[in-house]
């Protein structure tokens, strides 16, 4: 009983053979070559599907289904990628073409963030729940919503863009063109920008900060710089972390008040802070949520599937 998950990214295509226990039996990848025609990208996807089957001595005919997690607007009803800013897909029937190349195996598609959220709901931090949300704190803030046991993507399949809820009126400029989007305050990119700004502020004011020393040693500023400095007793590092977490909390409270999910799982680089992060934000979130102390509380958890979320989430799209 095997399924195949295809994690289609702007940089790499990763394909995994997933068993009935949601474990990846075999995984292979190749550069996407996003500048190429869509047909050529699908050729590589098909080849990887055959390769993982061959490595595990599984016949492609015995595959229950294949799922594709793709960036952009994915119409899961028709199997068409309506639009992707990172890939050459416009009204592109990706599911039909891949299915034909695989000998008729059923192919499902969805947005990559939705697929990751579905993976956490089926096999990860939200397993056993009927409603959940997953957010990914990386270059941006990705979001996926599971409502009544189904992926929520809106009537036009472009919903669940949680990173673009506005939390600061006329705030920081976002890549989407608007101002004040949550991802400009709560992504790993935003955290790095806050760290740089605080280091510059300290230099102007003649204050010392361990963040400068850490950056000199490592050669770069990362999402860990402020957290590591804070843990070492650095006041400026603590200021960065406190500011960052306040924005993260604001966005999470908004999500809870709108959807009241059973579980919110947090993935992406910032989630590597682990249980400390959950313990730090949990009290403020539930103090601020609507109906605090009266309604059942949403649980906040670290996502479990990590870097395999795309493959596993895609593989279980047919469930």
Predicted regions mapped to residue ranges:
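A short acidic/small-residue loop/turn micro-motif
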Residues: 31-33, 89, 158-161
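Short hydrophobic alpha-helix segments
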Residues: 28-30, 85, 155
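ATP-binding/phosphotransfer module of carbohydrate and carboxylate kinases, centering on a glycine-rich
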Residues: 1-65, 76-78, 96-106, 119-129, ...
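Short beta-strand segments
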Residues: 7, 67-71, 110, 134-140, ...
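A charged helix-plus-loop insertion that forms the helical arch/lid used to bind
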Residues: 79-90
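A glycine-rich, Thr/Ser-enriched phosphate-binding loop motif common to dinucleotide/cofactor-binding enzymes
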Residues: 109-119
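Short, charged low-complexity linear segments at domain edges
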Residues: 145-161
């Amino acid at each position: 009983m095997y399924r195949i998950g295809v994690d289609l990214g702007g940089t790499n295509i990763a394909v995994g053979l997933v068993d009935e226990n949601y474990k990846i039996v075999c995984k292979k990848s190749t550069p996407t070559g996003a500048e190429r025609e869509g047909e050529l990208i699908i050729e590589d996807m098909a080849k990887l599907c055959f390769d993982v089957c061959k490595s595990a001595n599984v016949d492609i005919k015995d595959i229950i289904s294949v799922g594709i997690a793709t960036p952009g607007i994915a119409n899961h009803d028709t199997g068409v990628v309506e639009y992707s800013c990172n890939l050459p897909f416009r009204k592109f029937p990706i599911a039909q073409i891949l299915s034909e190349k695989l000998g008729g195996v059923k192919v499902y598609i969805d947005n990559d963030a939705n697929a990751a959220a579905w993976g956490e709901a089926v096999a990860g931090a939200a397993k056993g729940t009927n409603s959940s949300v997953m957010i990914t704190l990386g270059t941006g803030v990705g979001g996926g919503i599971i409502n009544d046991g189904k992926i929520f993507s809106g009537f036009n399949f472009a919903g669940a863009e949680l990173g673009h809820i506005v939390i600061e009126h006329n705030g920081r400029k976002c890549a989407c063109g608007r101002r004040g989007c949550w991802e400009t305050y709560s992504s790993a990119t935003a955290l790095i920008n806050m760290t740089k700004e605080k280091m510059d502020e300290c230099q102007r004011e003649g204050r010392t900060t361990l963040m400068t020393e850490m950056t000199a040693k490592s050669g770069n500023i990362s999402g860990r710089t402020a957290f590591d400095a804070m843990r070492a007793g650095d006041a400026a590092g603590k200021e960065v972390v406190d500011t960052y977490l306040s924005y993260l909390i604001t966005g999470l409270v908004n999500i809870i008040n709108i959807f009241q999910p059973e579980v919110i799982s947090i993935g992406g680089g910032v989630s590597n802070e682990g249980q400390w992060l959950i313990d730090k934000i949990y009290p403020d979130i539930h103090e601020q949520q609507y109906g605090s102390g009266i309604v059942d509380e949403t649980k906040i958890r670290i996502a479990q599937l990590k870097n395999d979320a795309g493959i596993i989430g895609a593989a279980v799209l047919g469930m």
